[in-house]
């Protein structure tokens, strides 16, 4: 195995671990999930560019008769990238003590203010950061509102 194959293997493994954590791990951490809301997908064009670059590398590897393991690693890396960006839905998980947003756990006591913009974006002001939350369905904003009213 060459250095390139090792690096591809590491990145593929890291992306696979991230996908598993995002799908199953966050549900198990910090207690029971009380509310799950799907968010809008972002950065789709970035993934398309990434998969396009991987396709170029794959084509070059096949035409120059490169190592077969490199071909398999490039294909698996592209498939995981497609899964993460196009198949999986980003989500916001509400727990008893806080919520998961962008794979980070934020406790409720860190929230300083909450506002709703005209175009349906929930703005949560934290101590040093502002979260802009775009949900897929506007009804989910009402669910979030009722969750905060009932649980806080």
Curated annotation (Swiss-Prot):
Record InterPro entries: DUF986 (IPR009328)
Predominant place of localization: membrane
Keyword Cell inner membrane: yes
Membership in a protein family: Belongs to the UPF0266 family.
Superkingdom, taxonomy of origin: Bacteria
Organism placement in taxonomy: Bacteria, Pseudomonadati, Pseudomonadota, Gammaproteobacteria, Enterobacterales
Record keywords, A-Z: Cell inner membrane, Cell membrane, Membrane, Transmembrane, Transmembrane helix
Annotated compartments: Cell inner membrane
Topology in the lipid bilayer: Multi-pass membrane protein
HAMAP family according to UniProt: UPF0266 (MF_01071)
Listed transmembrane segments: 6-26, 45-65, 67-87
NCBIfam families the record matches: PRK02913.1 (NF002791)
Coiled coil spans: none
Example of a GO cellular component annotation carried by this entry: plasma membrane
Protein's UniProt name: UPF0266 membrane protein Spro_2816
Pfam families per the UniProt record, alphabetical: DUF986
